[in-house]
């Protein structure tokens, strides 16, 4: 029976915060091996337009994008959902009230309210070249699948999060005053379940690898959840099996040790 492996990107097979910006030969071998014999799905909070070319070039079996709000197997869309107009307006209103920035993501395009705000410069300035300005007249009919909001201080971040928790599901970014803002009830687990059903894979043959709180539901939705040694401490409290650090090819090493792939 084929296995179905879900793999996060940031902190799991890449780590830009620690200058690991290219996939290692071991990771490339692992994903190529799984793609030939089983199924491997890249699971990300990002939209397609924010994925590195090296990730797209992996040509995995599928993608979970926008933390589960847009899910693909090959070229087939198996699930998608978007924010209501009311939710978009509430997220904008609360974020601005606390001097934050917001980014709304469609499948291939991202829109930011201000390139000049202090909060944006603090957290997201490196993304400026791939973002567009949020102009209401131009985005009125855009389907947005996820948002990112960020602030200048902890107090603003916490208060904004409290005001939004009833209309969206928020996942805090480790080490930053910012969140992924997900459609209420949607998570990477949504993609796991839709893709597993589409491919008709038994639960006992499912695996997931992650390192952050936006991976929690995905990890809980599979039979074999695995977290990285460098995971958010909050994720480690759930008792998931742990593999090595991303810098030590933890993803590859787990697959090799458990005989899911052959050595490089």
Region roles according to the model:
Residues 3-19:
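Asp-based phosphoryl-transfer active-site loop
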Residues 37-40, 60, 144-146, 204-206, ...:
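Short active-site oxyanion
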Residues 98-101, 105-221, 230:
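Conserved acidic, metal-coordinating active-site core of Asp-based
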Residues 60-67, 81, 124, 225-229, ...:
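Short hydrophobic/aromatic-enriched beta-strand-loop microsegments
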Residues 58-59, 67, 163-167, 221-222, ...:
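Short, structured coil segments at secondary-structure junctions
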Residues 22-118:
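Active-site phosphate-binding/coordination module
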């Amino acid at each position: 029976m084929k296995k179905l492996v879900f793999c996060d990107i940031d902190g799991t097979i890449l780590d830009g915060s620690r200058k690991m910006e290219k996939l290692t030969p071991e990771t490339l071998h692992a994903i190529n091996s799984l793609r030939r014999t089983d199924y491997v799905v890249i699971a990300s909070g990002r939209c397609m337009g924010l994925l590195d070319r090296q990730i797209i070039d992996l040509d995995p079996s599928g993608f979970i994008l926008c933390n589960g709000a847009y899910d693909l197997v090959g070229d087939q869309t198996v699930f998608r959902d978007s924010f209501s107009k009311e939710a978009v307006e509430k997220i904008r209103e609360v974020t601005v009230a606390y001097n934050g920035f917001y980014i709304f993501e469609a499948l291939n395009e991202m829109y930011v309210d201000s390139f000049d705000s202090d909060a944006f410069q603090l957290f997201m300035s490196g993304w400026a070249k791939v973002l567009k300005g949020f102009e209401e007249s131009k985005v009125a009919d855009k389907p947005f699948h996820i948002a990112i909001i960020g602030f200048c201080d902890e107090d603003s971040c916490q208060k904004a999060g409290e005001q939004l928790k009833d209309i969206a599901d928020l996942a805090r970014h480790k080490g930053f005053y910012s969140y992924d803002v997900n459609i209420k009830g949607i998570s990477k687990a949504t993609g796991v379940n839709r893709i597993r059903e589409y491919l008709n894979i038994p639960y006992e043959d499912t695996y997931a690898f992650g390192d952050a709180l936006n991976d929690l539901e995905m990890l809980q939705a599979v039979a074999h959840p695995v977290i990285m040694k460098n995971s958010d401490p909050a994720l480690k409290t759930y008792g998931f099996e742990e593999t090595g650090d991303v810098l030590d090819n933890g993803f590859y090493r787990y697959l090799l040790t458990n005989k899911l792939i052959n050595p490089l």
